[in-house]
């Protein structure tokens, strides 16, 4: 089953662990344990999100996941040099609220032939930075959407829907203090309906935050920093997302 089909199958309880190749290649033993621990709960593993990481590091991380889990591996690219031929899929993203056109369309043009050549499953994804934004917002030169401005979020979410994106990814930023607020998630899901998958990431530190986001209507949650820092907490989140606790 492909990555998109796995997301559809697990709508409302999809877990997407995010692995940073820069961290993985320096702590392989730890991440092998992490992949094994989260495998049964994951819809797909995301690989990427790093700055200064190329195809070699991304490929090594994809290989580590595939060695320890049979779930699809999806590239979460920071640039075209992270497109990995051994991956199963790629979030073919546009950072809609970036002020730099390379994150809107230039990187997509550069990467499109690689995606085609490698035969990756391309999942059209609208990436939208909300709130603090963290490193993702800074690197992506995004005008982060203030959570208290629902009309701004509505414009971006509807634009993503009408442009035909299959997935909308609301990102608060890695390691931020606050995740995307439930009311913002609820609004986004109301506007997207069942036509578009809604995933949310950033600031998901424990199972209660994850459950709150899913109750608000998200189809899935992305967890990255908590996997790096506290595998036990990541497992608790995974069990709650799966509905097993």
From Swiss-Prot:
Record-given protein name: Geranylgeranylglyceryl phosphate synthase
Binding-site positions, Mg(2+): 20, 50
Main location, first listed in the record: cytoplasm
Top-rank lineage group of the source organism: Archaea
GO BP term (any one): glycerophospholipid biosynthetic process
Keywords attached to this entry: Cytoplasm, Lipid biosynthesis, Lipid metabolism, Magnesium, Metal-binding, Phospholipid biosynthesis, Phospholipid metabolism, Transferase
E.C. designation(s): 2.5.1.41
Residue spans crossing the bilayer: none
Pathway: Membrane lipid metabolism; glycerophospholipid metabolism
Family per record: Belongs to the GGGP/HepGP synthase family. Group II subfamily.
Gene Ontology cellular-component terms listed: cytoplasm
Binding positions for sn-glycerol 1-phosphate per the UniProt entry: 169-175, 202-203, 224-225
Enzyme class: transferase
Reactions it catalyzes: sn-glycerol 1-phosphate + (2E,6E,10E)-geranylgeranyl diphosphate = sn-3-O-(geranylgeranyl)glycerol 1-phosphate + diphosphate
């Amino acid at each position: 089953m492909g990555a998109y089909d796995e997301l559809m199958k697990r709508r409302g309880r999809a877990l997407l662990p995010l692995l940073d190749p820069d961290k993985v290649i320096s702590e392989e033993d730890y991440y092998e344990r992490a992949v094994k621990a989260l495998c049964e709960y994951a819809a797909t593993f995301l690989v990427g999100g790093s700055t200064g990481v190329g195809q070699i590091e991304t490929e090594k991380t994809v290989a580590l996941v595939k060695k320890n889990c049979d779930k699809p591996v999806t590239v979460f690219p920071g640039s075209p040099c992270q497109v990995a031929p051994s991956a199963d899929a790629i979030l073919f993203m546009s950072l809609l609220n970036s002020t730099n056109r390379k994150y809107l369309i230039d990187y997509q043009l550069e990467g499109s032939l690689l995606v085609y050549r490698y035969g990756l499953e391309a999942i059209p994804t609208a990436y939208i930075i909300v709130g603090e934004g963290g490193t993702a917002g800074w690197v992506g030169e995004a005008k982060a959407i203030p959570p208290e401005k629902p009309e701004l979020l509505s414009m971006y979410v509807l634009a993503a829907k009408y442009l035909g994106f299959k997935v909308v990814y609301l990102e608060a930023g890695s390691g931020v203090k606050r995740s995307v607020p439930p009311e913002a998630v609820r609004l986004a899901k109301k506007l997207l309906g069942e036509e578009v998958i809604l995933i949310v990431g950033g600031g998901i530190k424990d199972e209660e935050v994850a459950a709150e986001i899913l109750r608000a209507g998200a189809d899935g949650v992305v967890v990255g920093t908590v996997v790096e820092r506290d595998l036990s907490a990541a497992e608790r989140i995974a069990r709650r997302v799966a509905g097993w606790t």
